[in-house]
Amino acid sequence: MGVLALQGGVAEHEKVLRQLGAETRKVRRPEHLEGLDGIVLPGGESTTQSTLLRMEGLDGPLADAITAGLPAYGTCAGMILLATTVLDTREDAVRLGALDAVVRRNAFGRQIDSFEADLDFTGIDDPVHAVFIRAPQVTEVGPDVEVLARAPHGEIVAVRQGHVMATSFHPECQDGEVRVHELFLGLCADRA
């Protein structure tokens, strides 16, 4: 299982994936994409990640791999990178275009506005405790996008389109919360 390792919560995602029995590989260059069963795009700072993706020549190969069927799961900044349309970002920001959705950066406010909430999540029996840190929000979804979870006021915060999944929040930041990653690993197994 690959974890995009340019910036952000790489170690936290690796820890959860390993707890679930997955082998992990840090992805920093195009050749690191070879042979992966799936890839996690961690949270962090989306414009920084965008710049680094382009500098490493990874933006095109990553988009191509996901388009060709590589399962992908993006959290927070990863959701932003996966979306087809992003509001409140730089014009030159990388858009992998793998998720037919409109996403607004920092939709819930600044760092001081970070919050936690328990969410009903499609495919998971009990509520998921979600940590939102300068989180994006999905404002529109295409016809093939399934909404998996909403924030307490109805905002879309988790989605899936085929082999691509994304959350506004950080399940990797909640000790013992492995169920969202487990759902993604199931998606990867279904594609194998």
Model regions and ranges:
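Short glycine-aspartate micro-motif
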Residues: 3, 72-74, 130
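Redox-cofactor binding/interface segments in oxidoreductases and associated redox assembly factors
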Residues: 41, 74, 167
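General beta-strand structural signal in soluble alpha/beta enzymes
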Residues: 26, 74-75, 159
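N-terminal beta1-alpha1 cap of cysteine-dependent amidohydrolase-like domains
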Residues: 1-55, 60-67, 122, 178-192
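Cysteine-nucleophile active-site neighborhood
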Residues: 46-120
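Amide-donor transfer/coupling interface in amidating biosynthetic enzymes
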Residues: 105-192
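Cofactor-binding loop segments of dinucleotide-utilizing enzymes, especially the Rossmann-like FAD-
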Residues: 6, 77, 169
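Hydrophobic anchor at the start of a short beta-strand
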Residues: 23-25, 72, 164
